[in-house]
Amino acid sequence: MDIRVEYLSTSKTILFAGSELRYYLSKINNMISFSQDTEQTDETYRKKICLGLFPDSECSSDEDEYEIEISHLSGHIKGSNPRSVLLGVYQYLTLLGCRFLRPGKEYEWIPSVPHIEEIQISRRQKARYRHRGVCIEGADTPENILEFIDWLPKLGYNSFFLQFELPYAFLNLWYSHKNNPLKKPEAFSLEKAAEISSVIDRELQKRSLKHHRVGHGWTCSVLGQNTLGWVPSDTTLTKEQENMTALIDGKRGFFQGIPINTNLCYSNPDVIASFAEKVTAYAMLHPEVDYLHVWLADASNNHCECDTCKKHLPSDLYVHILNEIDRALTQKQLDTKIVFLIYEELLWAPIEEKLLHPHRFVMMFAPISRTFLQSYEIPEQLPAPVPYQRNQITLPVNLTENLSFLAQWQKIFHGECFDYDYPLGRAHYGDMGYLHISRIIYEDIHRLTDLKLDGYMSCQELRCFLPNGLPNYIMGKCLFGTDCSFEELVEEYFQAAYGKDWESCFSYLSRLSSLCNCDYCNGKGSRQNPAVAKNMKQVAQTAETFLSVCAAQDKAALPPVQQLFWKHLDYHREYCILLSKALFLLADGRTQEAGEAWKTFTYYICSQEDTFQKALDVYRVVEVSTNYTGFPLIENF
């Protein structure tokens, strides 16, 4: 069968979509061949697939929509922009039976479709939400990042957020092999990070993915510091620089020694001017960035207590700076979109200031302290937020309380707004089956419209695939829009990943999820918890029982992708046994024994990291478990 792919546009993204279409169709049916692509129409070719854009009146750079009309391997895939054409190609392949289960081609289920020429597909679909993305966290290799970017549009995502001016912090966490004493640190530099960043930029542009950038780090720039991550600095600030930092307990300087956690004296005219200048200069140099995130420092209870600052809410000072940035960008005739953050102290809405040009801005709701035991529910009446007390706040866990803060901001800002959420940042380590956290994601996304939020950005590790990639799979599908129930999406995923025995895997992982507590592992509540202890004992028993299912599986008879998923499930089984033992002892109040069990678990995952590097972020598991769950840091074995 000879097919010609015809391009109705010279867009690089549409050309890339064509190359992807050719690659996967040739995998689906090895009888398919492709004639040389050309822009010229030649009716002698009976089978032709055209890729192009809708008429100008139906095009939009922001709203993703595609149309698939293909019968007998002839027809078209069109979109509202080049990215939408690429999304349409991947949806066509999905309708043919392809399943993109994890980043990396080895984790794709590609069916054999012998009579593909008999298939007729007709679909037109518009994305349910405008903002559909993932933000980098954890320790990452360049390959981890690039494979994740390649995976995003296959599931319907349209955005990627590369935090900081350079992704040095996340790459260096990998190359330094922090939290894995079994691996030797490797040299890494800002120069190398810049090289990798350029490659990442090109891959985003190839797919026309919306490029989000920076976030935290502007406060470092104002102080003349590089953003190297959440690490201490021994730099001595000049007197002028020190006077720019927040006054806390009568002292100025780096907050707890960490530049990125250091807020500034935001009433200081020099700080305001420098902040606006830094953002404007970056925007001028980086027109490829679609959404420039302008945040303050990380951490909480670290705002300036000088006589001028303490007269104002942090959010009032923040909005004043945002207006100055808007004014500077306007003077330079830059239309850069600025994303501002509702987070920690900034949850309290301003009472004095307002954004003068709301169309410039996108509001991002970031409920970092929320519970993941439940999904969002909207009560008939929201309570009033607790009064703000400078540097004495307690972050809200309750979802209703979090939503009360959002509601106050939505009274004064009526522009674009999306949810920046954290199910795959820390909480997922507390759900060993990944079914609970996947359902939370499913339910949260289906409630975004009711919350007046136009999308979702997941702040997460790029290596969160143990036991599988179901959470991100469901996230992408739901954000673009699906009529499938949660159960239908799970079945679709598990059938492709595990084959004929998928129901055994589903029952097993569901049981694990039912026994787990995301919030406990995320540091919420007392460390001594009889219910958690009881459940962790059952987790170990459940995992040990599943050994017989793994042993009975004739893995050699499975397709390669399913062999990989079963291999990961076998590793994951031992992971669960060792981790649940440590959690049982911790929750039972046997701290010393818990530390020993934690050391055994840590050695296991560190020793296996090379084999399962793409599935589990060892650095992040250890970081979360020592900073939040309550285990000791193991520096050597």
What are these regions (language model features)?
Residues T10, S57, R128-L406, Q410-F413, ...:
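Aromatic-lined carbohydrate-binding surfaces of glycoside hydrolases
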Residues N29-I32, F100, G215, Q333, ...:
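Long, hydrophobic, amphipathic alpha-helical segments used as structural scaffolds
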Residues F16, L87, A273-S274, S504:
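Short, solvent-exposed alpha-helical surface patches in well-structured domains
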Residues T38-E39, R46, K452, K477-F637:
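Catalytic domains of carbohydrate-active enzymes that cleave complex glycans
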Residues M1-R128:
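Contiguous, structured surface segment used for ligand recognition
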